[in-house]
Amino acid sequence: MLKRILTLLLVFVFFISCSEREGTSTENHDGKTAKVFYVENSTTKIPVVVVSGTPYEMGFQLGETTKDEVNKCMLGFLELGQQSDEKYSDANLDDAWDKMLPYIDNRFIEELKGLADGAEVSLDKLRRAHMIPVISSFACSGVAVWGDATANGDLYHIRNLDFTMDAHLQDFPVIVIYKPDQGIPHIQTSFAGYIASHSGMNAKGIVFGEKGASPSKEYPYNYDGIHFSLLFRTMMYDASNLESALDMIERAKLIKRYYLYISDGKKETMGAAIAIVTTPDEVKLSIYKDNEKPEGTSLNVMDNCVY
């Protein structure tokens, strides 16, 4: 049921911020207010947090509003990782961050600082928790369908996240709506305190998802570049259409093996593409759009569909 709720939310919750609904407000030290709404049924209650302002202010509002959940979720995630595998040591996580730092959007860095201050949690620990997916091997799945492939012609973008449930991240779901002073408003479904993005959508109708493909035998990975989860946050701020999103992927220095699913839900430019990032000898990027059927692969075997 939780997965179904999150899927539906990605379609419509963005519009909550455009109308007045009942909820709670939390005013921070700068006078900026985070609005909190809830979607719930008999078994599940998910907070929808609307933040606004600069990246630091939005991070602070989010951290202050979800303080208890951030501490339990992110510190628990880090603790489990470090207890279960020595590769999640402080040294390894710090090394990944340091190598990627030249490529990380300063807006993400500032939001992370604000999140740590608002939630009153160690910035170092919060940063290390964000590096766990970067140095991990995992696989997910996704699909985008539109036009003749759907009953009503609308675009539907589906994303499945294959994280371990032992970390109990699923116990702390949160929907965050960002209304930045500069940049495109956007939304992401995540876990309390995790502000990198594995799926999200911006107000221009651009939707993001991925499938991991880096096997554990290739560990340790090369971190001299940008991880998709941080690149997605930049794209949410700046990508206004499918072409601009793909251009940002092409210009980025990418790391590891991934399938990146990007779709555009606007009627006039509706469509999707899959970007395939392959390593480790060298980073190779291949981008396929609808109706392109690469020889020898099973990609894009149906019209108006990428998966």
Descriptions of predicted regions:
Residues V11-F12, P133, H186:
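Residue-level signal for mature regions of secreted extracellular proteins and peptides
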Residues M1-L2:
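N-terminal secretory signal peptides that target proteins for export/translocation
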Residues L115-R159:
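Gly/Pro-rich turn-and-neighbor structural signature
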Residues S25-A116, D148-Y156, N160-Y307:
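C-terminal, well-structured catalytic/ligand-binding subdomain of enzymes
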Residues T7, S122, N241-L242:
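A diffuse structural propensity rather than consistent per-protein peaks
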Residues I16-S17:
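C-terminal motif of bacterial Sec signal peptides marking the signal peptidase cleavage site
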